[in-house]
Amino acid sequence: EGRLDMRMNPSAALSAWDVINTYSKEQLMEVFYKYGEINNARNLSAAIVTSRASNPINTTNELSDIARPFSGIKGMKYLAQVFQALRIEVNDEIKAIEEFLEQTPEVLSFGGRLVIMSYHSLEDRPVKNFVKFGVIKGQPEKDLYGNFFCPWKLITKKPIEATSTETEENPRSRSAKLRIAEKI
């Protein structure tokens, strides 16, 4: 049991406690749906808002106790998704990945390689689009003939994933994807 925090930078203003205890039901629902890919985000958000009306939600155990009835057959995986959503919101992780990717063409020399490991689909999606199309969101650039222009040559057509041996030794590696692209 720990205090709801989840900040990677302890001096950052926003903590998980702030999100859980100050966000509106709609804001919580968006966080859980967008970053946790939780289908019943509306019900979970309503339960959090109802619970905090009497007392603030201070610890991870308190939040787990509120979320557990909504987990269904997913159990611990559901709780992991709830806390993943909070962590991503608190640390603005997707924005950090996107900002990093946008800077890479300027700092990487021609022939330089971009190697990125992602651990879940929300991280992998912008990486995949960037190395495949040269953009994170929106339409990729096209040349005069309608061909896609991308400043990257894929070194790995598909992401490199952990082998069964690796996942046995290191269970956390099961979701890791490694993508490699070369600046052209």
Residue ranges of predicted features:
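S-adenosyl-L-methionine-dependent methyltransferase catalytic core, i.e., the SAM/SAH-binding region
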Residues: E1-I184
